[in-house]
């Protein structure tokens, strides 16, 4: 069985596309996991986008805690007998996947840009050395766990004729030793670079914050435009918020047009 999980619906839909391809080649079923309250509408959507089964792990967990989610997913994997596990590489997934691999004493490849079968083995490709090389790796243990960033694969077209099974099971997990005291939403400028079709991006080549107006002026000329930036502009200089941050450690984008100014 190929199992897919992310707490990000859009990322799950993207992973279901690659998961469906792998499941067919492995002659296995594709299962999407939902954690929390039963959500029949979400289950139906996942099935329409390629899932053969949706496993709803019902639990009273109110918010993400890595320890609790790790135990819960470990139980789901053992329950389903999944041999291939795809986890969304967002902030929660990056913490969850290695913990899960440790609990299951198995391998984990992170931020995969492609997955395929070679010599009957699951093979992964990921970017290393700041984008200067691609590492090609194979698993020698099961279950095999891989994380996938957003915007790597396109979701399958919705097919409401595709049928699937919905399984619901309640789980009790050991309460985490840590306690969430407060959740504070980060201030957002309402910028969504991940869905932008046209992006004008600036980097360290800009000497002054006021120079970013040049990028803003160009962006205004282009309809449907969004301003992006590299890590130094957001993380170091704080000239733009993290909403604009694009790159390996920032947002993953797939626009129709990308203009990079002052970025090496």
What are these regions (language model features)?
Residues 1-264:
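N-terminal glycine-rich FAD/FM-binding segment characteristic of electron-transfer flavoproteins
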């Amino acid at each position: 069985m190929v199992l897919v999980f992310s707490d990000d619906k859009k990322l799950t839909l993207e992973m279901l596309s690659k998961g469906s391809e792998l499941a067919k080649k492995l002659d296995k079923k594709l299962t999407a996991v939902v954690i929390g309250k039963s959500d029949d509408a979400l289950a139906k959507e996942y099935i329409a986008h390629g899932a053969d089964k949706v496993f709803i792990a019902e639990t009273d967990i109110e918010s993400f805690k890595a320890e609790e989610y790790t135990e819960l997913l470990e139980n789901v994997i053992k329950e389903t007998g999944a041999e291939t596990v795809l986890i969304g590489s967002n902030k929660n997934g990056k913490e969850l996947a290695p913990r899960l691999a440790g609990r299951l004493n198995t391998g984990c490849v992170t931020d995969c840009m492609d997955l395929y079968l070679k010599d009957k083995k699951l093979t992964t490709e990921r970017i290393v050395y700041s984008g200067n090389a691609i590492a090609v790796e194979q698993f020698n243990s099961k279950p095999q766990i891989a994380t996938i960033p957003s915007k790597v694969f396109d979701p399958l077209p919705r097919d409401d004729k595709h049928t699937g099974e919905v399984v619901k099971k309640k789980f009790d997990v050991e309460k985490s030793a840590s306690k969430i005291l407060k959740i504070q939403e980060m201030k957002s400028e309402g910028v969504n670079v991940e869905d932008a079709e046209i992006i004008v991006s600036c980097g360290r080549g800009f000497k002054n914050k006021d120079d970013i107006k040049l990028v803003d002026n160009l962006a205004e000329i282009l309809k449907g435009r969004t301003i992006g930036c590299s890590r130094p502009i957001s993380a170091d200089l704080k000239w733009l918020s993290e909403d604009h941050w694009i790159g390996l450690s920032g947002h993953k984008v797939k626009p129709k047009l990308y203009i990079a100014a002052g970025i090496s």
